Amino acid sequence: MDFNVTIVGQAISFVLFVFFCMKYVWPSVIFIIETRQKEIKDSLTFIENSKKELNIFKENSKNEIKIIKKNASKIIDSAIQQKTQILKQAYLAAEKEKQTILKQAKLDVMIEYQKARYELRQKVSKIAVEIAKKIINRSICIEEQNSIISSLIKKI
């Protein structure tokens, strides 16, 4: 292989090209690469931080949900107890009202019973007086008296 001027010229051109690239092109390429690497690193850091924040938020949400569920169950239990208490009070009030109504009804029945008894005595005494008057007014035979008495007794 001959070592001629063309090869030397190409070698010098290549060295100048490499020098030119190293001096002017390479720093901007390195700057762009470093900038991209920094952006990627920042993005990855941001993603990691976001994941951590998300996990913390999830844990906080779970804890808050547990607390809310406990409070809701306490409220429901309290409402059930209030319902039970209100029902008991209503039952007791209804029972008391029932007893009052029953006492009043018994009293009314007793009064009606006394009235009916009194009226019946009045009627019986009137009938007895009528019978006595009829017996006295009529001097009739015993057979007729017995028939009159039995007919009046049937009326009673």
UniProtKB/Swiss-Prot annotation:
Keywords: ATP synthesis, Cell membrane, CF(0), Hydrogen ion transport, Ion transport, Membrane, Transmembrane, Transmembrane helix, Transport
Chief localization: membrane
UniProt key word Membrane: yes
This protein's GO CC annotations: plasma membrane; proton-transporting ATP synthase complex
Keyword 4Fe-4S annotated: no
Membrane topology: Single-pass membrane protein
GO molecular function list: proton-transporting ATP synthase activity, rotational mechanism; proton-transporting ATPase activity, rotational mechanism
Gene3D superfamilies xref list: 6.10.250.1580
Alphabetized CDD domains for the sequence: ATP-synt_Fo_b (cd06503)
Location of this chain's protein in the cell: Cell membrane
Pfam families: ATP-synt_B
The protein's assembly and partners: F-type ATPases have 2 components, F(1) - the catalytic core - and F(0) - the membrane proton channel. F(1) has five subunits: alpha(3), beta(3), gamma(1), delta(1), epsilon(1). F(0) has three main subunits: a(1), b(2) and c(10-14). The alpha and beta chains form an alternating ring which encloses part of the gamma chain. F(1) is attached to F(0) by a central stalk formed by the gamma and epsilon chains, while a peripheral stalk is formed by the delta and b chains.
PANTHER family according to UniProt: ATP SYNTHASE SUBUNIT B (PTHR33445:SF1), ATP SYNTHASE SUBUNIT B', CHLOROPLASTIC (PTHR33445)
Function according to Swiss-Prot or TrEMBL: F(1)F(0) ATP synthase produces ATP from ADP in the presence of a proton or sodium gradient. F-type ATPases consist of two structural domains, F(1) containing the extramembraneous catalytic core and F(0) containing the membrane proton channel, linked together by a central stalk and a peripheral stalk. During catalysis, ATP synthesis in the catalytic domain of F(1) is coupled via a rotary mechanism of the central stalk subunits to proton translocation.
Family: Belongs to the ATPase B chain family.
Protein name: ATP synthase subunit b
Organism: Buchnera aphidicola subsp. Baizongia pistaciae (strain Bp)
